[in-house]
Regions:
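Short beta-strand segments
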Residues: 5-6, 74-77, 127-130, 155-156, ...
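A contiguous loop/helix-start segment that scaffolds small-molecule binding in enzyme catalytic cores
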Residues: 148-243
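Generic beta-sheet signal
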Residues: 1-5, 70-76, 124, 149-155, ...
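Class I SAM-dependent methyltransferase SAM-binding "motif I" and its flanking Rossmann-like core
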Residues: 10, 82-149
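Class I S-adenosyl-L-methionine
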Residues: 1-101
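Cysteine-centered metal-binding/redox modules
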Residues: 243-315
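Short gly/ser/thr-rich secondary-structure transition/capping motifs
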Residues: 7-13, 134-136, 197-199
Length: 315
């Protein structure tokens, strides 16, 4: 039996099924860094460590050992089916007869990263910027369509010491289509625990990322709340009509509507000058989830339409 086992981004994310498969395996094969990360749970096993870049030889060896009657585990970080060993193994076994294979899913880097960043995922696309196996022209096309489709974009292999052009192209396309204020979450897993940063696209620099980084690019509705990225999925967040709105309508129907800033309002000033307190009669107020640029003022217990990009303008 050949077991393709995803160990997730760290030992603490291994599934119970994967742990049992490791325990049942006679031989463990994998990239040295991944093997070392689970060394304490594979003690007593025959372990074969390989270097980066010899994935084909690693796969052939695992198949050969399994055909000899061994129960073999080949290790993949994250999930084996997401830029992992599963694809390669299934290409290789076409040359052989009677190779029994089972895949054990793992927590993918994109899911792990998204959870650290908050709740940024909605409809999303996953793109690797590595052009070792994929032409740059194809990567460019995928980036353009994902950006135009307003997908959240999870980016694997964003950059390396010798491979910078795909990242530069990626950033240029996103700036042109999405704009400089687009939120980007960076999860750097080069060390443990992983480090997270959230920046605007215009602030995303080459020196801030590496080959172990996973990027989560927000869409047009993604916003920042309490340091977390959030992409609303369309849930209706119901809010009672605020007393300030009721007060406005009472004055409106009595012909006593204030013009300009309402200096008598106990909440004034709660937003930028020039909006003339129009949040009080906005038919969508309070919009409730922050996706339009508004924000909740905790100390005043009121919703501010400052920076709202949906209905209001600063003109």
């Amino acid at each position: 039996m050949l077991n393709i086992i995803g160990i997730g981004p760290s030992k603490g994310n291994i599934t119970l099924d994967a742990l049992k498969a490791l325990d049942d395996s006679d031989i463990i094969i994998g990239y040295k860094k991944y093997i070392d990360s689970i060394s304490d749970i594979i003690e007593g096993k025959e372990v074969i460590k390989k270097g980066m870049g010899d994935e084909v030889a690693r796969g052939e060896l695992a198949i050969s050992k399994s055909l000899e009657g061994n129960n073999v585990a080949i290790i993949s970080s994250g999930d084996p089916g997401v830029y992992g060993m599963a694809n390669l193994i299934f290409q290789l076994i076409g040359k052989y007869d009677d190779v029994d294979v089972r895949i054990y899913p793992g927590v993918s880097a994109l899911n792990y990263s998204a959870d650290l960043l908050g709740a940024p995922l909605h409809d999303f696309a996953t793109i690797s910027l590595s052009n070792l196996l994929t032409p740059l022209s194809e990567i460019k096309t995928k980036i353009e369509y994902a950006a135009k489709g307003n997908f959240i974009i999870a980016v694997y292999n964003p950059i390396s010491k010798s491979r910078k052009e795909p990242f530069r192209l990626f950033k240029k396309i996103l700036l042109d289509i999405r704009g400089p204020e687009t939120l980007v979450g960076i999860v750097d897993s080069s060390s443990y625990p992983s480090k997270t940063t959230i920046v605007n696209l215009s602030e995303l620099n080459e020196e801030d990322i590496n080959m172990f980084s996973c990027l989560i690019v927000g869409n047009k509705l993604t916003y920042l709340s309490e340091g977390y990225m959030v992409t609303p999925r369309g849930y209706a967040i119901k809010n009672d009509i605020h007393p300030a709105s009721k007060n406005f309508y009472e004055k409106f129907f009595n012909g006593d509507t204030p013009t300009g800033p309402n200096y008598e309002c106990e909440y004034y000033p709660c937003h930028v000058y020039g909006q003339y307190c129009d949040f009080c009669y906005c038919p969508f107020y309070p919009c409730g989830d922050g996706s339009t640029g508004g924000k909740w003022i905790k100390g005043k217990d009121i919703w501010s339409c400052e920076d709202c990009t949906w209905i209001h303008s600063k003109d």
